[in-house]
Regions:
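Conserved alpha/beta-hydrolase catalytic His-Asp/Glu region
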Residues: 145, 149-150, 166-223
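Flexible "cap/lid" loop of the alpha/beta hydrolase fold
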Residues: 124, 131-168
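Catalytic histidine-centered segment of alpha/beta-hydrolase-like enzymes
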Residues: 265-277
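Conserved HGGG/HGGXW glycine-rich cap/lid loop of the alpha/beta-hydrolase fold
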Residues: 32-80
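Active-site loop/oxyanion-hole signature of alpha/beta-hydrolase fold enzymes
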Residues: 34, 67-110, 114
């Protein structure tokens, strides 16, 4: 996404803040607050629900105050301001505004997939916002998954994928998402949940956010992120990707990140928190110590 577009996408935020568990609402995100203690932000991925963090929230809420984000247009949430134009940068801006409006002091941030990319963007654009970052199965340049060296190389493919998605009927979209989710969530229950969220997502918002994610490259800015970063990535032999190829993908793409720890979670597809909840919870505990 080009930074020069941000000026045309400024969002006026109106927050509803309560002292206990409550909802804070803008036209880009909804934030549900649970628990008491140090602040932790949880950002879901593309076409995902904030409910992807339910088990994590139950595990943490007795010791942390959790700010669980729902992106407008995903998982049945009304698209609101995400109904047109760009999605990712304005959502990052909304998260920054939420942190500052509520005077959160350098909260820890955990982001899955697209949420991990947004967490990285937040960390280099607003370093004061992030006291620690956990990135869950996400890359600083998703185009690397398609063999692209830079955004220009992946634009034709990203454009074709976006336009194909936009052209689908709702029935075709639902069928394709149902099939696709089988490659992203290994556990039957997790796959069922992820499929439900994807099918309920606004097709236009998903298509545009997917294009933006594929063509956004924050690798040149990783050196600006000084806060500690934990990167979890999934691997399973059923994906057909050799372990010898999976590990270097993350090591190479995050090479410029100065203060990082990369951890592989085996026997899991993309939704680590659904496929390996105990392993995921253990890594979250280590991160939050």
């Amino acid at each position: 996404m080009k930074n020069k577009l941000i000026a045309f996408l400024t969002v006026a935020l109106t927050w509803q803040v309560y002292t206990a568990a409550a909802d804070a609402v803008s036209n880009r995100i909804t934030v549900t607050v649970r628990g008491h203690g140090p602040d932790v932000l949880l950002i879901p991925g593309l076409a995902s629900s904030s409910a992807v963090w339910d088990a994590t929230a139950s595990h943490l809420e007795n010791h942390f105050r959790l700010h669980i984000i729902q992106v407008a247009g995903f998982a049945g949430a009304p698209p609101q301001a995400n109904a047109q134009a760009t999605v990712i940068q304005p959502t990052v801006d909304a998260i920054d505004a939420y942190i500052k409006t509520n005077r959160l002091q350098a909260p820890r941030v955990i982001g899955h997939s697209l949420g991990g990319l947004m967490g990285g963007m937040l960390a280099y654009q607003h370093p004061e916002d992030v006291g620690g970052l956990m990135i869950v199965d996400s890359l600083p340049f998703f185009g690397a998954l398609f063999g692209a060296k830079d955004p220009a190389a992946v634009i034709p493919q990203a454009t074709a994928m976006r336009d194909q998605l936009l052209a689908q009927t709702q029935d075709d979209y639902a069928k394709n998402q149902t099939a696709f989710m089988r490659s992203l969530a290994k556990s039957p229950d997790g796959c069922k949940q992820a499929t439900k969220w994807a099918v309920a997502s606004d097709k236009s918002v998903v298509a545009r956010a997917m294009y933006e994610a594929m063509t956004t490259d924050i690798r040149p800015r990783l050196h600006k992120i000084k806060t500690p970063v934990t990167i979890l990535h999934a691997w399973d032999s059923l994906t057909g990707i050799p372990q010898a190829a999976s590990d270097p993908l993350y090591q190479e793409n995050y090479a410029a990140l100065p203060n990082k720890k990369i951890v592989r979670i085996d026997d899991s597809f993309h939704f680590i928190m659904l496929d390996q909840p105990d392993k995921f919870a253990a890594q979250v505990d280590i991160f939050l110590k």
